[in-house]
A protein has these predicted regions:
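Donor-nucleotide binding loops and adjacent catalytic segments primarily
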Residues: 2-3, 168, 174-224
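Conserved nucleotide-sugar phosphate-binding/catalytic loop shared by glycosyltransferases and other
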Residues: 6-70
Length: 224
């Protein structure tokens, strides 16, 4: 989305806040536009605790983490408000709630881009009253560009526009280069990529295929 906005709006400048681990990728991906992009780190404190021994979510620890995160949201929003540069015309978030409180306080449009919010996730661990501050923060958003396969009516953002399926443009020459370098005769080549991290160590992948995967994915033993 950032790339598309920069393509169609040659006078547009973006302040892009993302996890420190994504800054290098964002800089490389948007390198054609770096004169108009400011990259700064932001870490959301929402954490799902994982019990690696039993290969499941630790519900009790996750609940504690969610409640602690919600208790700190207002203060986090105050800090983000102080960092808001002059001249900003809109705040777009995927899909941290603090962004909408900041936009509301500044009198700016607050736009979400996602197919869920952390409110629905938190509802799986906490009661409605406990996560009401989270609902209230999301309700300050003006609009959600709602991807396919969304959590629908459970999303506490009132105004939604269906956004359909979205992907980056295909680079046919780059795909051809990858096939020449990695594709083996009679063996399908599968590309795996996620927005964050994903462990596949206990999930069976067909050994008759070859896999390319992005940083953050841990493949099963025997898959390189």
């Amino acid at each position: 989305m950032s790339e598309a906005l920069l393509e169609v709006q040659p006078d547009l400048h973006l302040v892009l806040r993302c996890h420190p681990g994504q800054l290098e990728f964002a800089g490389n991906y948007l390198r054609r536009f770096l004169a108009r992009v400011e990259l700064t780190p932001f870490v959301s404190q929402f954490q799902i605790a994982f019990d690696e021994a039993n290969w499941c979510i630790d519900n009790a620890l996750t609940r504690q983490s969610v409640l602690r995160w919600i208790a700190e949201l207002s203060q986090t929003a105050v800090g983000e408000q102080a960092r808001l540069p002059a001249g900003i015309r809109a705040v777009i978030s995927d899909i941290v709630p603090e962004a909408f409180a900041v936009a509301k306080q500044a009198g700016l449009p607050g736009i979400g881009v996602s197919n869920y919010t952390w409110y629905e996730v938190a509802a799986g661990f906490c009661g409605p009253g406990e996560i009401e501050p989270l609902r209230t923060m999301y309700e300050q958003a003006d609009l959600l560009l709602n991807y396919e396969l969304s959590t629908g009516a459970a999303i506490p953002i009132r105004s939604k526009i269906p956004a359909g399926l979205i992907c980056r443009p295909f680079n046919d020459s780059r795909i051809a280069e990858i096939r020449i370098r990695y594709k083996q005769p009679e063996r399908p080549l599968i590309f795996l990529s996620v927005g964050g991290a994903l462990s596949l160590e206990r999930i069976g992948l067909c050994e008759d295929f070859d896999y390319l995967y992005t940083r953050g994915i841990n493949p099963p033993a025997g898959i390189t």
